[in-house]
Curated annotation (Swiss-Prot):
Keyword Nucleotide-binding: yes
Cellular localisation: Cytoplasm
One GO process term, biological-process aspect: 'de novo' IMP biosynthetic process
Family of the protein in this entry: Belongs to the AIR synthase family.
EC number: 6.3.3.1
Pathway linked to the protein: Purine metabolism; IMP biosynthesis via de novo pathway; 5-amino-1-(5-phospho-D-ribosyl)imidazole from N(2)-formyl-N(1)-(5-phospho-D-ribosyl)glycinamide: step 2/2
Cellular component GO terms held in the UniProt record: cytosol
HAMAP family reported in the protein's UniProt record: AIRS
Name assigned to this protein: Phosphoribosylformylglycinamidine cyclo-ligase
GO molecular function: ATP binding; phosphoribosylamine-glycine ligase activity; phosphoribosylformylglycinamidine cyclo-ligase activity
Length: 346
């Protein structure tokens, strides 16, 4: 039977066209250490130029979760790749690692070349923001597994750090200052609840502007996750950092303790930073308790850094010179977990 694979739902020619379209975007991410080009069986990266005493490779992998469903609804696919990169590289930079390269995995029901190109365009933009090379990936057309409009997206990154410069959090002491770096919005966590609260139960429209939002709801919800790599690497060159936490699923309450040693807790000063209107809208429409909000969402802070008190103001200044909005949001204390405003639990 001629064209049997195509009749089974897999269009090889469309796959070839997608690869051809994405090449120009991938090329913009290249670093001098990359060996070979797109299309090889494996991506290669030369580590011989790194003058580190004890080089350690740090890896991370993640996906975008159900934020993808918002991209499907809005038929907007050129920024979701930034989210995939951000979720991976932010996780490894908190250990002091410079992201070197990234690989993506796209699984779809139908390989539409223009859609795949837009996804990879976003991935490439994320890689440029993080300074890492997109050295490979896989696009799997899987009819019957996904509908023709659906796809899943995941990524994998590898970074490098000198062993003596790994940021572990083990030297954090009571009295260290916590600096928060502003998020761009919801980032890439909690979207199952977001959809239920705002779209299913609240019946809000993606095309309308609500409350104090400055953008239509769909655009607000699809804002890409902020990538903190370059400002954090600049910070590490200039100051000692004792611990860092990427505020993802689990919010403040789950993620800040991940960087703290036993016997040390975090006390957060509510009101010390701006909480974006999208979080207020979610809490109001969903009638969500404040504790639940801080246990699910980043609440306006995407990264938390622990530093000595005497360095805090200089570090805030450096981060703001790097284009970040940074605020002192609390400090470490004797104890455990996360409390708010004078030691109260929410």
């Amino acid at each position: 039977m001629a064209n049997a694979y195509k009749q089974a739902g897999v269009d090889i020619e469309a796959g070839y066209e997608a690869v051809s379209r994405m090449k120009k975007h991938v090329q913009t991410t290249m670093r001098k250490e990359v060996l070979g080009g797109l299309g090889g069986f494996g991506g290669m990266f030369d580590l011989s130029k790194f003058a580190l005493e004890e080089p350690v490779l740090v890896s991370g992998t993640d996906g975008v979760g159900t934020k993808l469903m918002l991209a499907f609804m809005a038929d907007k696919h050129d920024t979701i790749g930034i989210d995939a990169v951000a979720m991976c590289v932010n996780d490894i930079v908190v250990q002091g690692a410079e992201p070197l390269f990234f690989l993506d995995y796209i699984a779809c029901g139908k390989a539409e070349p223009s859609k795949i190109e837009n996804i990879v365009k976003g991935i490439s933009e994320g890689c440029r923001q993080a300074g890492c090379a997109l050295i490979g990936g896989e696009t799997a057309e899987m009819p019957g597994m996904y509908s023709t409009e659906e796809y899943d997206l995941a990524g994998f990154t590898v970074g490098i750090v000198d062993k003596k410069k790994i940021v572990t959090g083990e030297k954090i002491e009571a009295g260290h200052v916590l600096i928060g770096l502003a998020s761009s919005g919801i980032h890439s966590n909690g979207y199952s609840l977001v959809r239920k609260v705002l779209l299913e139960d609240g019946e809000l429209s993606l095309d309308r502007i609500y409350g104090r939002l400055e953008l239509p709801l769909g655009e607000e919800l699809l804002k890409p996750t902020k990538i903190y790599v370059k400002p954090i690497l600049e910070l590490l060159k200039n100051h000692e950092v004792y611990g860092m936490a990427h505020i993802t699923g689990g919010g403040f309450i789950e993620n800040i303790p991940r960087m703290l040693p036993e016997g040390i807790g975090a006390e957060i000063e509510l009101g010390s930073w701006k909480i974006q209107p999208i979080f207020s809208l979610l809490q109001e429409v969903g009638k969500l308790e404040e504790k639940e909000m801080f246990n699910i969402f980043n609440m306006g802070i995407g990264m938390v850094v622990a530093v000595k008190e005497e360095d805090a103001k200089d570090i805030v200044r450096l981060l703001e010179e790097q284009g970040e909005t940074a605020r002192i949001i609390g400090r470490t204390v004797q104890g455990a977990g996360v409390t708010f405003n004078g030691g109260k639990a929410l």
